[in-house]
């Protein structure tokens, strides 16, 4: 069973926490290098891939309402990650499953998300047949602020454990319903288990219409970018990646939507090394595949960043 402690540690976004200084100071250059760990035994390509160069900004000082102002995070170095004996894909378990819960509007393109996740993790990703919310028998409530229905994440995670197929590395439920991890929390965007290979996240609050705001002309691109972030963030947790405190990184925790929007789509050197250690992918080919996807999706800034990483990792950059 996923406890509240686990929910605090691994939730993608939680809202309702009161801003309070936890005395967090961003790690300095030496601490960031120690988090990456020694790379002298790696290939030249991997040494360049995990180098802390200027394409990876360090973690900024959190604002009063940001995640690290409200939650104590000690960080997870690459060495600590290795010692934790995280879940790793093997010859049998190499498929990531996405389980839709409830109805999805046409603009929520699940095939695009499936394709993106396949490029990001360099693994096969399959979308399962959608099921209704009622079929799961999940605990629900009406949020006192939004007056919208919410589903208890712990119930979904328990239900998903029975859905792990023999070839499944993990299974992630995706829904348009709002979520909450326990009665005292306002809501949560997503939650995943670091050890049990199950997770859930919601698209609901990524659409400006949820808050009664007008949808801009590029709102579909905005929703796609947000959905890509939470999908890969939560799946990253199922690989054993904890929240990142070292660089501006996809795996940073976030306490509100604006903070989530500030997070990049990419992994920092520490977290990239963790994922590459687990999945064993070719870093350059992965960057190339992600850049092509982003170009086709109209995410031009992200595509340019990825192409710059291709050059630097190959050794042809300045």
Walk through the language-model features, giving the residues of each.
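Bacterial N-terminal signal peptides
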Residues: 7-17
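N-terminal low-structure segments adjacent to metalloprotease catalytic domains
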Residues: 19-164, 168-170, 174, 284-318
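Generic domain-boundary/flexible-linker signal
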Residues: 107-109, 182-183, 212, 262, ...
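Active-site-proximal segment of zinc-dependent metalloprotease catalytic domains
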Residues: 165-232, 238
